[in-house]
Swiss-Prot record:
Gene Ontology biological-process entries: translation
Functional description taken from the UniProt entry: Forms part of the ribosomal stalk which helps the ribosome interact with GTP-bound translation factors.
GO CC entries: cytosolic large ribosomal subunit
CDD domains from the UniProt entry: Ribosomal_L11
Homology family: Belongs to the universal ribosomal protein uL11 family.
Keyword terms of this UniProt record: Methylation, Ribonucleoprotein, Ribosomal protein, RNA-binding, rRNA-binding
Entries under PROSITE patterns matching the protein: RIBOSOMAL_L11
InterPro entries assigned to the protein according to its UniProt record, in alphabetical order: Ribosomal_uL11, Ribosomal_uL11_bac-typ, Ribosomal_uL11_C, Ribosomal_uL11_C_sf, Ribosomal_uL11_CS, Ribosomal_uL11_N, Ribosomal_uL11_N_sf
UniProt-recorded name of the protein: Large ribosomal subunit protein uL11
Keyword RNA-binding on entry: yes
Keyword Plastid in annotation: no
PANTHER family: 60S RIBOSOMAL PROTEIN L12, LARGE RIBOSOMAL SUBUNIT PROTEIN UL11M
């Protein structure tokens, strides 16, 4: 018989840097989950990733105080900013441009995000990434 689910917890945690301090500790503690067990498992799974890259994670909490978690790919905005070499997007995205990325960089981001995007094919995923970049004030060349 399947375990009874008592809730889902959605967090964004830097890769390899999960620790019991907020936001991880309070979110897991109020469900009665073992915080250190999660931190060790998360840090072990994110070992190969770039340290500090924010990773969305969905934790499923069960009634017997056990849990499972699913990691998603890093947010598209973070990957776009990294590719463009900027700290933050434009305050006025359609008038002030803050950086540029190429179509090849957009394709690379789309491939990394492909599991989380609902696009039918790679070209549609690239257009989705390009739209996100434009809304941040970053120009996409070759599109």
């Amino acid at each position: 018989m399947a375990k009874k689910i008592i809730g889902f917890i959605k967090l964004q945690i830097p890769a390899g840097k999960a620790n019991p301090s907020p936001p991880v500790g309070p979110a897991l503690g109020q469900r009665g989950l073992n915080i250190m067990e999660f931190c060790k498992a998360f840090n072990a799974q994110t070992q190969g990733m770039e340290p500090g890259l924010p990773v969305p994670v969905v934790i499923t909490a069960f009634a017997d105080k056990s849990f499972t978690f699913v990691m998603k790919s890093p947010p598209a905005t973070v990957l776009i900013k990294k590719a463009a070499g900027v700290q933050k997007g434009s305050a006025k995205p359609h008038t002030d441009k803050v950086g540029k990325i190429t179509r090849a960089q957009a394709e690379e981001i789309a491939k990394a995000k492909n599991a989380d995007l609902t696009a039918a094919d790679l070209d549609a995923a690239v257009r989705t990434i390009a739209g996100s970049a434009r809304s941040m004030g970053i120009t996409v060349e070759g599109l």
